[in-house]
């Protein structure tokens, strides 16, 4: 604001103040004089009552007019649309104000175009970002809008309500044991592997930081947590003693021998009555671990009852073509009882 504009503003405010003082001073003289004249007359009480009553009525009438004007002004403002911008001289007589409004409108338009698409990917903690907001060079590992905290909480819920820790069902724990207690009992106690001990401590620290820090889980923390789960899942598989009982199976993945050898799981591998029993009869105890069922190594096959072994033994298999023909015949004769899953 220039010096001349400041001078004009100061003169306007000063003159307004002086005018208001004079108006109030002259207005007060009339009621004071009326009260003084009424008190000197013969009927002092009656005249005073008339003068004071007239002043009260005048005051109430003025207040009523002011309130009515305020309500009328408010109703007029309601008729104006909220998105209406006063840019015309009739709405906003002050020229500088109109120019400021127009300049801000142009600036808002430029900012809208500039900020419509962020310069860098916007990734918030706690949720997996959508593909359009992700870094182009990063591999998409998880579904969009995946809640990291819910996934981590499901691990403890499975441990708490189902007794399942990672992929091990045989978890010896008490009701008051925490996640850290289970990790210590599984991978820290009586363990001489320094790498596993270090990773187990990092696993516990990371879990407690995620669950009890009160902050959203970052993407790096969640990826690190998943890596720890996969690592200790593989460790628990290799340390599971129930795998030692499965070495007696002769799998047909890389051998021409179809069937099973004599073992503690079956007295006679070609006994049809034994095959009619439950599949879990072949195991000394139910398995206590989770395994993949998609690989060849998890399926053991035996000769189905639909194959004529007598005729096959009368003609020894001398050539590869005979072996292939028998293998094709066996594959067509398999039933659901000829598959043992573990």
Swiss-Prot record:
Residues 37-47 are extracellular. Keywords: Membrane, Transmembrane, Transmembrane helix. The chain crosses the membrane at residues 16-36, 48-68. It is a multi-pass membrane protein. It comes from the Eukaryota. One of its GO terms (cellular component) is membrane. Residues 1-15, 69-342 are cytoplasmic. It is found in: Membrane. Required for growth under high-pressure and low-temperature conditions. Belongs to the DLT1 family. This is Defect at low temperature protein 1. It comes from Saccharomyces cerevisiae (strain JAY291). The gene is DLT1.
